[in-house]
Amino acid sequence: MDHRLLEIIACPVCNGKLYYSQDKQELICKLDSLAFPLRDGIPVLLETEARPLALEESHS
């Protein structure tokens, strides 16, 4: 994941900051407790493709 891209993209739901999870290959929005997948290194920033984070995931 290109860190320059991470600086300019935002959560499509709340426009909040996204955090990269390298081990899960996801972009995390802590405000909405959503995880957006990366497919072939490309962020899929669609709310319908996001998975809800478990409570323990959203606080880490």
From Swiss-Prot:
Query: Gene3D superfamilies given for it?
Result: 2.20.25.10
Q: Which family would the database say this protein is a member of?
A: Belongs to the UPF0434 family.
- Write down the InterPro entries for this protein, in alphabetical order: Trm112-like (IPR005651)
Any GO CC annotation of this UniProt entry = cytosol
Please give the Pfam families that the UniProt record associates with this protein: Trm112p (PF03966)
Q: What is this protein called?
A: UPF0434 protein KPN78578_09190
List, alphabetically, the SUPFAM superfamilies matched: Trm112p-like
